Amino acid sequence: LDMYARLSSTQTAQLAEDSDFTIYDGGMNLVQALYLNNTVEPLNNVKVRQALCYAANRQEVLDMIADGKGTIIGSSMFPAFGKYYVPELSERYNQDIEKAKELLKEAGYPDGFELTITVPNNYQQHIDTAQVLVEQLKAIGVTAKIQQVEWDSWLSDVYADRKFQSTVVGVDAAYLTGRALLERFTSTSSKNFINYSNEEYDKLYQQVKTSTDEEEQVELYKKMETLLCDDAANLYIEDMACEVALRSDFAGYRFYPLYVQDMAKIYKVK
C-alpha cells in the first residue's frame, strides 16, 4: 500500500519510524462531543449540562486517547470552516470542579446523579473518549456508565428515535456553509437528535435564511454557535486529529474542510 488514512496514534507512531513513509497531520473535520439529550432528566436543566462541561478536562482527553493531538472546540463548528469558526468558545468551559459542583447543587443534585453514555461499538476513539469522561465525572459525583451498541442500533435508537441520555460521537458536514453543522439544532429539525430547543436560536436561523448578505450570515451563524455553547447543549470536546501516511516517493496530499481523498493531487517524486 502507498497510503494509509485516518491512522490511530499507535499506527502513526509505527509508521513514523519507517523512512519509507511521510506523515501528514490535519483535522478530521468533525465535531466530537458528549451529545446530551436536552429533554431527559436531569439533562433538561441547563445548570446540569453546564456542570458536566466544567467537570471535563478536554486536554486530558486528547492526551490520553491521541497523544495530545486534536483541536479543542467549544461549539458545533470546527477550525477548517474558517470564517464561521469562533475559537474563543473553546475556552468557555475550562475545567472548574468547584464551579461544576456548585451548579449541580443549584440544580438540585448536590450528590450528583447517574448517567448513561451510549457509544457505537465500531468507533474505538469514541469509546476511549467515553472512558476518560467516566473517570473525570466522578469528581463531581456523577456516576457514568458506558453502553456500547451496534452502529445500526445507534442510528435507530439514538439518532432516529432519540432514546438515550448521552452519547459520544462525531458529527461532520456535507457541504461548506455554517448551515451544514448548525441547521440540525433548530427545534423542528429531523436531525436534532439532542432535542435542543431555543427560540432565539430558531429566530437567528430564520434570519440566516432570509439574508442575502454573506457577512451578515456569518455573524448570525456565530451567534448560533455561541448560544449552543452558553446553553451547554452538548459537552463539546474536539475536532479529532487525522493523520495520513503516504509512501515517501509520493507527495501532494492535501486536507480539505470536508472528508475527501483527492488522489488527483498526489504525484510521484521518485
Model-derived features: positions:
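Ligand/substrate-recognition segments at binding pockets and active sites
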Residues: K105-A173, T188, E214, C242
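Structural transition elements
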Residues: T71-E106, Q124-H126
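Ligand-binding "clamshell"
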Residues: T12-D25, D161-F164, T177-N192, S248-A251
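Periplasmic-binding protein-like
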Residues: D25-L36, T39, L43-G82, T188-D202, L228-Y236
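Long beta-strand-rich cores associated with HINT superfamily self-processing modules
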Residues: V244-K270
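Extracytoplasmic/peripheral linker and loop segments enriched in polar/acidic and small residues
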Residues: K47, K145-W154, A160, A180-S248, ...
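Extracellular/periplasmic solute-recognition and catalytic clefts
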Residues: L1-V40
